[in-house]
Amino acid sequence: MSDNRIYTDRDCVETGCGCSLKGKVVVLKESNLEAGFGRQLYYCTGGNGANANALGKSVFLVNLKNGEFERCVRDHVLGVLKPELMPDEEKLQLSQIRPPGALPLENHEPQYSGYSFLEDGRYAAGVWLCNEKEAMEYVEMQKPYQHRIMLCDRNDFCVWEVRDGMQIYPPQEKLDEMSEGLVKNPGPMQL
């Protein structure tokens, strides 16, 4: 269904060189479809052209149809997609992307797995996350687009859950207790 849709500036929450692209789903201009880019929707992982009012031009992307890494110039980007317009298949592909700067799995043992669910319950396989920082970055990058996000520990127990952008587990009281404990006994936090 999303294959035939042509996205325009009306489908973007931000457009132009003044918006930051990193960590967001971006729309490539329709003219780029003929220039070798077969899709309009990509996840931006960075590049010297990804910042607002960037001096550079390179933008690094992940294709939300096939998961392949690609590069374009900033001028090819129309803007940042409105989250509510993201098609389900692209949401599933986005759920498989580890946060930019994630540690390589070859020499780091994952501590968590991240899952993102569509409203109908569909999801793709979990994503390995090596530490708390990566786990929280995964939640933040998925939150605008996904219905439900769940982080599980190595034993596959849920340690964090967000639904429709709102944290539901652990409850706020538990987080308050944890933060009070950190003030009294500083040290690593366990999710």
Residue ranges and their predicted role:
Residues G121-Y123, D156, W160, G165:
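Residue-level signal for glycine
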Residues E180-L191:
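Non-Sec secretion/translocation targeting segments of pathogen effectors
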Residues L118-G121, G126-D153:
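A short, charged, amphipathic alpha-helix used as a generic interaction element across diverse proteins
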Residues G101-A124:
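Short aromatic-glycine-(Arg/Gly/Cys) micro-motifs in beta-strand/loop hairpins
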Residues K24-F37, L118-Y123:
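Beta-loop motif signature
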Residues V59-G101, P171-Q172, E177:
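Intrinsically disordered, low-complexity, charged/polar segments
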Residues K29-D75:
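Basic/aromatic-rich interaction segments and small domains that mediate binding to polyanionic partners
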Residues M1-K24, K29, I97-P99:
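Mixed-charge, Lys/Arg-rich low-complexity intrinsically disordered regions
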